[in-house]
């Protein structure tokens, strides 16, 4: 593991920082509530990114973790890729979240690439990344059984999300 600061300077670790570090730094700056971030190339989530499809909310497992459809960025232009691929990847993610709350939606699919997932801590980000892959897998299986599965009704989505998140959460163990 390599630790870098928000100026992209290595703080600790023997390895080189990820080529995606600039993207991460941009997201930490744009979304102050983020305390940890994970970038994966998990199979099912990547399949949605490559197919240029957002991940719709079909069930309560999805709603327990994400408040709605997992968003997809637009494609980067050839000029954006040539100019600053990693920086412009951060830019299109931030652009996609212009009207989304990154706390309620801690994941995004980068078009033709892969997911970026975050949380209040590194462990929360990792748990969200696992949840994202699971809901992507469930959505793919839903498509197999029904090419047009119905979306989870909004009132059920909101209930499942709010009972696990926020000041009035009732799901899970009491935090000490």
Name what the model sees in each region.
Residues 1-176:
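Glycine-rich flexible loops
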């Amino acid at each position: 593991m390599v630790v870098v600061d928000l100026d992209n300077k290595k703080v600790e670790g023997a390895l080189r920082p990820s080529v995606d570090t600039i993207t991460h730094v941009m997201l930490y700056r744009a979304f102050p509530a983020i305390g940890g971030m994970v970038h994966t190339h998990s199979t099912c989530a990547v399949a949605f990114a490559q197919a240029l499809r957002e991940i719709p909310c079909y069930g309560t497992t999805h709603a327990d973790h994400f408040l709605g459809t997992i968003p997809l960025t637009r494609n980067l232009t050839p000029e954006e890729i040539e100019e600053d691929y990693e920086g412009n990847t951060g830019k299109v993610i931030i652009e996609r979240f212009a009207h989304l709350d990154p706390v309620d939606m801690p994941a995004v699919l980068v078009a033709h690439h892969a997911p970026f997932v975050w949380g209040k801590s590194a462990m929360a980000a990792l748990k969200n990344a696992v949840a994202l892959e699971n809901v992507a897998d469930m959505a793919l299986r839903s498509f197999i059984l029904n090419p047009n599965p119905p979306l989870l009704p909004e009132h059920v989505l909101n209930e499942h999300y709010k009972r696990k998140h926020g000041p009035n959460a009732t799901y899970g163990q009491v935090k000490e």
